[in-house]
């Protein structure tokens, strides 16, 4: 059964035969890897049950290794791992989905790299986040199949990831006075939400940080993207002007609240600008 944790005595090189180790069986997606020695890798894995972990996959770069496929970036596998002093160690792995089509297209690959970097940025080691894991798995699936436009997946994923991380944009009440209104005309990134017409007249209340004009239609699409399952994102036709507004606001929202510059996002921008 996925995610079942058992206690067992594990005999392996460097571990005492009498040392009790915790063995976990869990689904996971490789976010990134670093080569180690001649044939090993350190994997950063977003798991379903254990949160983000760093695990050593011994010999995984050898052509005949049983861990070869499961140690590649973006691959979804079932892992059996045990926890050592500094790292987890991969004992077994069974590949569930490689999302192979992502690797055949540079633009898809660029999106996936950014999605993985975002997930790594907001996840914590050994703190489970099944919602984040399932979100990433679904997004990689639809990115691979091409059933949902990449740009739509991009915006939808970012908003849902921020929601899971505790940064859901406030679209229902004025971020300054707290009143509900149909007259929201600005979105403040620093304040994390919309600003009503009355409060928008006093620039001193919201002048810090990025502030965007926002229409009622844009707010409604924001709500749709936040509240709709990834699999149904393409059920609503979105005006290009509104989509571009949301894309700009979402980007600023993420960079501000996560306080990080993502190299993979810069690379994605370069790929899109090149017309690839």
Residue ranges of model-derived segments:
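Non-catalytic alpha-helical scaffolds and adjoining flexible linkers that form interface surfaces
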Residues: 4-6, 13-276
């Amino acid at each position: 059964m996925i995610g079942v944790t058992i206690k067992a005595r594990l005999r392996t090189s460097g571990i005492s035969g009498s040392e009790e180790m915790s063995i976990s069986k869990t689904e996971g997606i490789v976010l990134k890897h670093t080569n180690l020695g001649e044939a090993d890798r350190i994997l950063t894995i977003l798991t379903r049950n254990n949160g983000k972990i760093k695990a050593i996959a011994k010999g995984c770069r050898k052509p005949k290794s049983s861990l070869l496929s499961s140690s590649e970036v973006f691959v979804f596998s079932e892992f059996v791992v045990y926890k050592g002093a500094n790292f987890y160690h991969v004992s077994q792995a069974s590949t569930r989905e490689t999302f192979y089509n992502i690797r055949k297209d540079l633009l898809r690959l660029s999106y996936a790299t950014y999605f993985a970097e975002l997930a790594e940025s907001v996840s914590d080691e050994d703190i489970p986040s099944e919602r984040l894991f399932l979100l990433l798995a679904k997004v990689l699936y639809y990115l691979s199949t091409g059933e949902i436009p990449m740009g739509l997946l991009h915006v939808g994923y970012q908003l849902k990831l921020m929601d899971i991380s505790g940064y859901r944009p406030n679209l229902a009440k004025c971020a300054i006075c707290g009143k509900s209104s149909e007259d929201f005309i600005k979105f403040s990134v620093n304040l994390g939400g919309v600003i009503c017409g009355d409060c928008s007249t006093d620039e001193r209340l919201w002048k810090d940080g990025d502030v965007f004009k926002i229409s009622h239609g844009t707010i409604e699409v924001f709500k749709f993207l936040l509240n709709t399952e990834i699999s149904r994102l393409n059920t609503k036709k979105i005006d290009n002007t509104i989509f571009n507004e949301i894309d700009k606001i979402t980007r600023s929202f993420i960079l501000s609240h996560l306080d990080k510059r993502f190299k993979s996002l810069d690379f994605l921008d370069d790929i899109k600008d090149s017309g690839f």
